[in-house]
Structures are given as structure tokens and as C-alpha cells.
């Protein structure tokens, strides 16, 4: 196993732990695009602030994980409930 594989495995393991933590803390994830977009934007802005404010690497990585988890939860919900999302999109168009 190369060093990159080891690093990727470690990151993925940490990401899975963070997904479990986030899901336990916030079990509901919005299905409509607009509320989901707001959550994604908030996490991205927190990551951007951590970088721009020269916060510690640990803090930047923490915010990067939060952003990644939010994106993964969005993707997961889209795949789990495609009919629900299609219905929500029709409702939003009215």
C-alpha cells in the first residue's frame, strides 16, 4: 500500500465518522434544492473564513470535513429519494 492510499483510507475513515456524527446531531437533511444549497453555502463560507483568517490547519480541516459531509449528505438524499426531489422541484416551479 502506498502512502497516498494510506492517507486516503484515513481521510475516508474520518469522513465516515463525521457523517455519523452529523447525522446523529442533525438527522433531517432538507430535500428541496434551495434549503440544501443554503446549508452547503454556509459550510463553504465557514471553510473560507477559516482559511482567510489563517486559523490552524486542524480548524481548516475540520471545516473542510463539514463541507464534504454536507455535500455527501446532499448527494445521498438525491439518490435515495429521486421521486421526492422531482416532486419538490415541481412544487417549487408553481
List each language-model region with its residue ranges:
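Flexible "arm" and connector segments at domain edges
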Residues: 1-94
